[in-house]
Amino acid sequence: MRAVTILAAAALALPAYAQQKAEDPLVKRGRYLVQIGGCNDCHTAEYPQKGGKVPEGQWLAGDALGWQGPWGTTYATNLRLYFQELTEEEWVKKGKTLKARPPMPWFNVQAMTTSDLRALYRYVRHLGPAGKPAPAYLPPDKAPSGPVVRFPEPPKK
């Protein structure tokens, strides 16, 4: 009986814990950074097509839309699953050295302050896991099976 009481008390405390996390100033800052940084443009399915009118509960869960160019075909990572695999310290270290294929602006992530990297991490973790992993990268000689945005070849010099 005592175990049931303890479990019930813990379950009642969870909403309060979640609310506290939502009020964390870094969570709020992270949400702001996601919005102004354009993260949703690629990492949230149909975000640009819907003029940004996608429920926040669907944000950053990746997309099956491919981005194809001379590098091959890339897909926006499901950040909500990706961040579940990293500690905050691992993300900060990775964010400072991140390199990725186009069109990911990895150089902008590298330019972020440590505080902003922490804020981004806490916001995405606050959203919780959702969705499924994005399709894997395809080299230039492999044809994607789904829709893609095609980038032109760069001009010859």
What are these regions (language model features)?
Residues 1-9:
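Sec-dependent signal peptide recognition
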Residues 9-18:
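Hydrophobic h-region of N-terminal signal peptides that target proteins for export
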Residues 22-23, 36, 44-74, 89, ...:
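Flexible coil segments in periplasmic/lumen-exposed cytochrome c-class electron-transfer proteins
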Residues 29-37:
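Local sequence-structure signature of Cys/Sec-based thiol-disulfide redox active-site neighborhoods
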Residues 41:
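Short, cysteine/histidine-rich loop/knuckle motifs that typically chelate Zn2+
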Residues 80-84, 93-95, 106-108:
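A structural feature that tracks compact, well-ordered secondary-structure segments
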